[in-house]
Design a protein with these regions (language model features):
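Acidic, proline/glycine-rich low-complexity IDRs
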Residues: 9-10, 72-130
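Proline-rich intrinsically disordered, low-complexity coils
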Residues: 14, 20, 58, 65, ...
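Generic recognition of long tandem-repeat/solenoid scaffolds
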Residues: 24-32, 48-50, 95-105
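N-terminal "first-domain core" detector
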Residues: 1-30
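Short linear motifs in intrinsically disordered
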Residues: 17-20, 36-40, 82-90
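A short, compositionally biased
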Residues: 23, 44, 90-92
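Intrinsically disordered, low-complexity regulatory segments enriched in Ser/Thr/Pro
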Residues: 34-69, 108-130
Length: 130
């Protein structure tokens, strides 16, 4: 799968929050207030990257899903009403939750864009769609 094929598959999905763009073989999707998603796919090499566009810009986290999972992973990030929650700790950063805002398991979360809250020995970082 190429990034162009990934882009074509994503834009056909229903209920997208917004439409991603394709620039120099990189899919760019501005979903969040202070961060955006970059995705790349070529001959089995896949990357999804959450990039901060705040003062200290750079990659917040990236992962390498299987090629057959790329469309579903991106769709979960970009489906209208979904949010991403990352858990940061001394050991690294990982995905804590991707899904509908109303189904997020911690009811006492701080509803901030790119908000942070201490939780269980780490820090949760919230990305809600703008």
């Amino acid at each position: 799968m190429t990034t162009q094929e990934l882009y074509n598959a994503i834009i056909c999905k229903p209920d997208l929050h917004s439409r991603p763009t394709l620039h120099d073989d990189i899919l760019i999707w501005h979903l969040y207030q202070n961060a955006y998603v970059q995705a790349f796919c070529h001959d089995g090499d896949t990357t999804i990257d959450i990039v901060s566009n705040s003062l200290f810009s750079g990659s917040v986290m990236h992962w390498h899903p299987n090629e057959e999972d790329m469309v579903d992973e991106l769709y979960n990030l970009g489906k209208a009403g979904n949010m991403l929650v990352l858990k940061k700790s001394l050991l690294g950063t990982g995905i804590f939750y991707i899904g509908p805002v109303q189904n997020f398991p911690l009811a006492d979360r701080t509803p901030l864009h790119f908000g942070k809250k201490k939780w269980d020995g780490g820090q949760l970082v919230y990305f809600e769609q703008k």
